[in-house]
Design a protein with these regions (language model features):
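Active-site cofactor/cluster-binding pocket
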Residues: 3-198
Length: 198
């Protein structure tokens, strides 16, 4: 699928230029997470293009979402140019690291820093990539909503200084676009992830 939307409702206070990769497997809410960031950017008046690839319809299959915010025409993020990688599955982090530019940001749902292969750790260091690992699954389980790990990881990511979005803007979008029956638990997961890092 290709998403092309132009922010026309507001004139942005400042230009946002960001290329994001969101990666996971079917059933983890990768596409909903992508919507959170794209809807936030649009609400702030920015242009957005994006594309989702791979096994979206197959539960458990790889899902990779490309999202570019700013003056872009092509929706795909080329290898070595991405600013942010959000990996909702640690194995997908391995598969998608090459999308990040030197000095990029990687936030991974994983069991702890020790899961990185030594060779990958060397790659991260050599390329100046800021890598953060967060047990979002555990946080989601602790609040009784295992399917909300995506929101917990986003909350955590918003506490990282390099993340090019404001906490208040993302939270407002979650509140606005989440169906009413899931709104409370989604905000709870997001807030739990954000607080864990503060």
């Amino acid at each position: 699928m290709r998403l092309v939307q132009r922010g026309v409702s507001l004139k942005p206070e400042s230009e946002l230029d960001a290329k994001l990769i969101l990666a996971g497997v079917g059933g983890q809410g990768v596409l909903f997470a992508t919507s959170i960031f794209s809807e936030t950017a649009l609400a702030l008046g920015h242009d957005v293009v994006g594309s989702e690839t791979h096994g979206m319809s197959q539960r458990g299959g790889s899902v990779i979402s490309h999202l570019k915010i700013g003056a872009y025409e092509s929706p795909m993020v080329r290898h070595g140019t991405g600013d942010v990688l959000l990996a909702f599955d640690w194995q997908e982090a391995y598969r998608t690291l090459a999308f990040l530019r030197r000095g990029g940001l990687c936030v991974v749902n994983g069991p702890g820093e020790g899961f990185w292969d030594p060779g990958v750790k060397g790659y991260l260091t050599a390329n100046g990539i800021a890598a953060h690992v967060y047990a979002a699954d555990d946080v989601a389980m602790s609040i009784g909503s295992p399917r909300s790990a995506n929101l917990a990881l986003i909350g955590y990511a918003l506490s990282v200084p390099e993340m090019p979005f404001a906490h208040a803007d993302i939270r407002a979008t979650i509140e606005r676009i989440t169906p009413s029956k899931f709104r409370e638990v989604n905000l709870k997961a997001f807030d739990a992830g954000y607080r864990r890092q503060r």
